[in-house]
């Protein structure tokens, strides 16, 4: 998970805690630039990435595919994601960096407004199709954590405050 797990998005939550939810404001790249890293979780993911080279750190986000560049830029200080090994500050793909470990990155399809539990279940199933076998999941939302816990053999780490949004 990205929002609330790797990045502190609390300053943007006010836009979706009201009725009607203002998803456009919540997803505004100008606001996302102020998302703060949650370094303890980032450090755990980086430790796995660098100390267990046979294993992959796989990223799955409920963010829409159209937010890929913003998301990759937000995480680029700590991670390189498959297909986006090097990105310029303008958000354009640069030359690939072959020596740096990269990570698969799954995102919600564009215009998919289903619940995160449904989307992340499908992302998990796609990971299996792609040959990955996730063993450990970090997430922050109670409903999504419940969904992850229902998958046999998967260890789940709750990094949230028990808050839905």
What are these regions, as identified by a protein language model?
Residues 1-111:
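Alpha-helical substrate-recognition element adjacent to the catalytic core
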Residues 13-15, 66, 114, 144, ...:
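Flexible, glycine-rich phosphate/dinucleotide-binding loops
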Residues 91, 115-127:
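Short loop-to-alpha-helix "cap/lid" segments that border enzyme active sites
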């Amino acid at each position: 998970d990205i929002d609330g797990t790797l990045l502190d998005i609390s300053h943007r939550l006010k836009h979706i805690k009201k009725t009607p939810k203002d998803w456009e404001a919540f997803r505004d790249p100008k606001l996302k630039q102020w998302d703060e890293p949650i370094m303890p979780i980032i450090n755990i993911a980086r430790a796995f990435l660098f100390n267990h080279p046979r294993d992959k750190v796989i990223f799955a986000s409920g963010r829409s595919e159209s937010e890929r560049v913003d998301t990759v830029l937000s995480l680029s200080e700590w991670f390189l994601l498959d297909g986006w090994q090097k990105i310029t500050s303008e958000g354009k793909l640069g030359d690939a960096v072959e020596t740096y470990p990269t990570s698969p990155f799954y995102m919600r399809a564009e215009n998919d407004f289903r619940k995160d539990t449904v989307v992340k279940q499908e992302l998990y199933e796609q990971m299996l199709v792609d040959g990955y076998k996730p063993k450990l999941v970090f997430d922050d939302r109670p409903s999504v954590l419940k969904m992850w816990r229902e998958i046999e053999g998967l260890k789940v780490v709750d990094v949230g405050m028990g808050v839905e949004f």
